[in-house]
Amino acid sequence: MAKEELVEFGGRVSEVLPDSRFRVTLENGFEVWAYSSGRLKKNRIRILAGDRVTLEMSPYDLTKGRINYRHKV
């Protein structure tokens, strides 16, 4: 069985929440909950409010996502 296709969105972190979760405002104006990917946690990449990020989201639940890249300033 093939892995489901993920949808990528760009956005900006609007709030840092406990337990390495974030509230992200997407480029189209929607707000979603997001968490750091394992690669970001492993390499101890810090994500702060105001950072531009790229999210992966399931097409079945567009309210939650996984942050897989933090853009450079």
Curated annotation (Swiss-Prot):
**Cellular component aspect of the GO annotation:** cytosol
Under the heading CDD domains, the entry gives: S1_IF1 (cd04451)
Domain S1-like as annotated: residue spans = 1-72
Please name the PANTHER family in this protein's record.
TRANSLATION INITIATION FACTOR IF-1, CHLOROPLASTIC
Under what name is this protein listed? Translation initiation factor IF-1 3
UniProt-listed InterPro entries: NA-bd_OB-fold (IPR012340), RNA-binding_domain_S1_IF1 (IPR006196), TIF_IF1 (IPR004368)
In terms of Gene3D superfamilies, this protein maps to: Nucleic acid-binding proteins
Taxonomy of the source species: Bacteria, Pseudomonadati, Pseudomonadota, Betaproteobacteria, Burkholderiales
**Assigned protein family:** Belongs to the IF-1 family.
